[in-house]
């Protein structure tokens, strides 16, 4: 976990569910700082990052069932799936990470996975 010398500086991330059920991760920082922290957390979780684009604010991640922590959530799939995490700064100088299922299937297991992934990221702080 990222630790701080004072209680005032503790990073507090929140996870919200959208109308579609997909999770959104909220960092209390600007886009640049949130980008660094998100990358660190993905590395800590050993998430397979296929590609990243800091200017766009996107991470493309690969999830392979039966491999590590996330295999339990997507156990029926037999191939690697790629998802996009898009980081956007809002007017309050907070940043939101939006989970995008590139297959657009809106599968219930994928929707649940978005919340589980973001909960795991938030637990790193």
What are these regions (language model features)?
Residues 1-125:
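Ser/Thr-rich, low-complexity intrinsically disordered terminal regions
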């Amino acid at each position: 976990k990222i630790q701080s010398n004072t209680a005032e500086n503790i990073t507090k991330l929140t996870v919200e569910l959208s109308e579609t059920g997909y999770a959104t991760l909220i960092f209390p920082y600007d886009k640049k700082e949130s980008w660094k922290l998100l990358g660190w957390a993905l590395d800590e979780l050993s998430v397979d990052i296929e590609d990243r684009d800091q200017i766009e604010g996107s991470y493309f991640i690969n999830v392979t069932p039966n491999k590590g922590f996330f295999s339990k959530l997507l156990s029926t799939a037999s191939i690697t799936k790629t998802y996009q995490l898009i980081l956007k700064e809002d007017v309050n100088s907070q940043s939101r990470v939006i989970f995008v299922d590139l297959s657009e299937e809106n599968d219930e297991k994928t929707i649940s996975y978005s919340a589980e992934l973001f909960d795991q990221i938030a637990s790193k702080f």
